């Protein structure tokens, strides 16, 4: 809205030309979302406590996390509000990619909201069925990717990290591939959200990393120089990434150990889903394995645990899955686990950025 109000005035007031720049607006989208989440945080927590939206702790981690029972959850509503309001204020709202990104973010958030509401209403840790959750994710992701593929400037070619001119065209297979990326990322963040600050830290790192990739993909000069696919207009989504980073930092203000507020599925599913969609937008889908390495490790640990438990007749690889609970049961302090996972996330984001020159 600010963009559409001030840019037309730049012909009369030259200083307003600065609002044309994506980088400038991304920075202020970050700051706006940060202020919104920090200022509204206390009110949100009081409201959630008033309507009894407290966290229920599963039996397996009851002894470790019993002090967390009753902590306000569904804090993803606060984060989502900050992201969407900031994006609406600072982005070019004539850009289809911005609207698709917000659609994915809100859609996955709605699936998470229904799941959280079901848990709270039933006073248990089980929400909607896995099939219902997957169906909701497929509906949102399928709609967004379907609309994306219809855009003339978008291609179904796949960029492969470390290879300069190897871009296989997946054709109709691109749709299920993109759905796998988005839903996998969504569930990966959801599985990681088990300790104070654990999921939001790598989410901030991943959003920052993809802000670079999405900006480069939308800039024809940079895209050609770095040999990455150019998607005209997609650079505007950098503003959304800035808002996501800012809201994430504001949410971390209250989610840091000991957490005063949990994001719930409304936060984790929306963040993961939109990170996957941004990876699809800028044609860096495979790099999400590196950028979101923490989420990948957590997901793999669950798959390994469940698979081995079934084939071995009840034996386990880890003391508990996801992986962060394994370290908890080994006696590693929660704050140390979180900080170490953050460090790993930062290193993997830097590794992903380095692929821009390793080709």
UniProtKB/Swiss-Prot annotation:
Pfam family, one: MraY_sig1
Domain of life, per lineage: Bacteria
Entries under PANTHER family matching the protein: PHOSPHO-N-ACETYLMURAMOYL-PENTAPEPTIDE-TRANSFERASE, PHOSPHO-N-ACETYLMURAMOYL-PENTAPEPTIDE-TRANSFERASE HOMOLOG
Annotated protein name in UniProt: Phospho-N-acetylmuramoyl-pentapeptide-transferase
Purpose of the protein: Catalyzes the initial step of the lipid cycle reactions in the biosynthesis of the cell wall peptidoglycan: transfers peptidoglycan precursor phospho-MurNAc-pentapeptide from UDP-MurNAc-pentapeptide onto the lipid carrier undecaprenyl phosphate, yielding undecaprenyl-pyrophosphoryl-MurNAc-pentapeptide, known as lipid I.
Membrane-spanning residues: 27-47, 73-93, 94-114, 134-154, 166-186, 197-217, 233-253, 261-281, 286-306, 336-356
EC number of this enzyme: 2.7.8.13
GO biological process, one term: peptidoglycan biosynthetic process
Organism classification: Bacteria, Pseudomonadati, Thermodesulfobacteriota, Desulfovibrionia, Desulfovibrionales
Membrane topology: Multi-pass membrane protein
Keywords assigned: Cell cycle, Cell division, Cell inner membrane, Cell membrane, Cell shape, Cell wall biogenesis/degradation, Magnesium, Membrane, Metal-binding, Peptidoglycan synthesis, Transferase, Transmembrane, Transmembrane helix
Reaction catalysis annotation: UDP-N-acetyl-alpha-D-muramoyl-L-alanyl-gamma-D-glutamyl-meso-2,6-diaminopimeloyl-D-alanyl-D-alanine + di-trans,octa-cis-undecaprenyl phosphate = di-trans,octa-cis-undecaprenyl diphospho-N-acetyl-alpha-D-muramoyl-L-alanyl-D-glutamyl-meso-2,6-diaminopimeloyl-D-alanyl-D-alanine + UMP
Molecular function GO terms recorded: metal ion binding; phospho-N-acetylmuramoyl-pentapeptide-transferase activity; UDP-N-acetylmuramoyl-L-alanyl-D-glutamyl-meso-2,6-diaminopimelyl-D-alanyl-D-alanine:undecaprenyl-phosphate transferase activity
Pathway annotation: Cell wall biogenesis; peptidoglycan biosynthesis
Chief place where the protein resides: membrane
InterPro entries membership: Glycosyl_transferase_4, PNAcMuramoyl-5peptid_Trfase, PNAcMuramoyl-5peptid_Trfase_CS
Localization: Cell inner membrane
């Amino acid at each position: 809205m600010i963009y559409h109000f001030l840019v037309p005035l730049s012909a009369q007031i030259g200083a307003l030309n600065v609002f044309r720049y994506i980088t400038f607006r991304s920075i202020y989208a970050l700051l706006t979302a940060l202020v919104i989440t920090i200022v509204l945080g206390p009110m949100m927590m009081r409201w959630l406590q008033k309507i009894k939206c407290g966290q229920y702790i599963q039996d397996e981690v009851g002894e470790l996390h019993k002090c967390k029972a009753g902590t306000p959850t569904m804090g993803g509503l606060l984060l989502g509000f900050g992201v969407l309001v900031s994006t609406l204020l600072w982005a070019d709202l004539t850009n289809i990619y911005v609207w698709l990104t917000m659609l994915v973010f809100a859609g996955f958030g709605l699936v998470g909201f229904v799941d959280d509401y079901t848990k709270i209403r039933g006073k248990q840790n089980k929400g909607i069925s896995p099939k219902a959750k997957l169906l909701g994710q497929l509906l949102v992701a399928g709609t967004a990717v379907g609309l994306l593929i219809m855009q003339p400037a978008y291609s179904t070619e796949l960029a492969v990290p470390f290879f300069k001119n190897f871009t296989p065209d997946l054709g109709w297979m691109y749709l299920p591939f993109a759905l796998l990326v988005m839903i996998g990322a969504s569930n990966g963040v959801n599985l990681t959200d088990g300790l104070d600050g654990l999921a939001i830290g790598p989410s901030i790192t991943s959003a920052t990393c993809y802000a670079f990739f999405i900006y480069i993909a939308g800039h024809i000069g940079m895209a050609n120089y770095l040999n990455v696919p150019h998607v005209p207009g997609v650079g505007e989504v950098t503003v959304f990434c800035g808002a996501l980073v800012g809201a994430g930092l504001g949410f971390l203000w209250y989610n840091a150990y000991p957490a005063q507020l949990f994001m719930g599925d409304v936060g984790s599913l929306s963040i993961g889903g939109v990170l996957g969609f941004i990876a699809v937008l800028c044609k860096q889908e495979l790099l999400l394995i590196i950028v979101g390495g923490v989420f990948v490790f957590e997901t793999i640990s669950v798959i390994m645990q469940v698979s081995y438990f079934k084939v071995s007749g009840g034996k386990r690889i880890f003391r508990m899955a996801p992986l962060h609970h394994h370290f908890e049961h080994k006696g590693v302090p929660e704050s140390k686990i979180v900080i170490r996972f953050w460090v790993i996330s930062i290193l993997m984001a830097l590794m992903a950025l380095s692929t821009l020159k390793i080709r």
